[in-house]
Amino acid sequence: MPEQTLRDHLVAFGLSEKEADAYLVVLRSGQSTTSEVAQAADISQGYVYELASELVERGLITLDESTTPTRLRARSPEEALGTFSERLDQLSDELDQLYRRAEPGDPAIELVHSRSTVRKRIARTVDRAQDEVVATLPASEFTHLRTALAEARDRGVTIYLQLVSPLEKLPADIDWDSHGTVVKTWDATPPVTVVADERAGVMGAHSILSGRHDSAYALVFSQPDIAGAFFGNTVSNFWPMGELRHVATPDPLPATYDHIRTAVTNAALHRAAGRSLRADVTIRQVGSEETSTYEDVAVVDVRQHLVGEPTNEFPIENSLVFDTPDGPIAAGGNDGSLQPFYEGYAAVSVTLVDGIVES
């Protein structure tokens, strides 16, 4: 088996990438000093002691501190695998008990420590997105995620992408339009946050994907209330701090949307280009399932701050205001966890139409 494949398997079993590197150094030689491990795995000698403690706890090595220098000795594969097998059997029993107690449809929440697993969960989140992705990620992760982002854009997913420190890791000559609707950069280290369709995603410390992540964990979730909270935190506190790198051309008109935040973003881009807008809109009052439809009404205001100059009154406000025969009506989104609580109306469907070009 190639060593890289073995390393991947070890990471899949819960070892960090550095733990796997250190263990393979010891495994190859049978025993190694801390300095030998540090040199071969390209890590500091002080960090080797920390990794060694983890590997001892996992039952993979023994630590002989009676010698000078301290020696790390690999346990036989039979002993090491026996430890893994015992833990897997115990885990299987515990999972089975939890599964039998759980009610159908319980939200999935997962704590992940492995960097490679976090990357896989983020890619899965983007792969499953139907309408929208909001992501704050270290710039070094763009290479790992660029295929998933490009495929999501091809599916028509709106992507708000903020890439943060280390910005020097960004590849040159990126076709931003193929990977994001609105792209920003920010030389800071906010938490990693990826939310899809305001229903599922991943959130963790910046260090889980950049530099040494030590004891950092990421939360993987598929509960709308949790997704909405992380979405609101990201767009309120971190998104405004970024420097704009790219904005996609708005959708050609007429365009119909059932995901209203996408309609709001496109409306903002059209108005920034000097176009007035009219719309056919179906709305429902909050707390009611009955809908009303207005045809060929003017869009008199766009309230948002995801693209261009902010026009909202509070961070998560995202709505269109229509001049209807019943007076001005502000309508927010109809899906996700952030249901309209300010506007009073939710837009079920909106068709934007080009109005008279403003002078």
What are these regions (language model features)?
Residues 81, 87-154, 158-159:
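PLD-like (HKD) phosphodiesterase/transphosphatidyltransferase domain
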Residues 262-358:
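N-terminal accessory interaction module
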Residues 129-176, 287-301:
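Primarily the HKD phosphodiesterase
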Residues 181-234:
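HKD (HxKxxxxD) catalytic microenvironment of the phospholipase D
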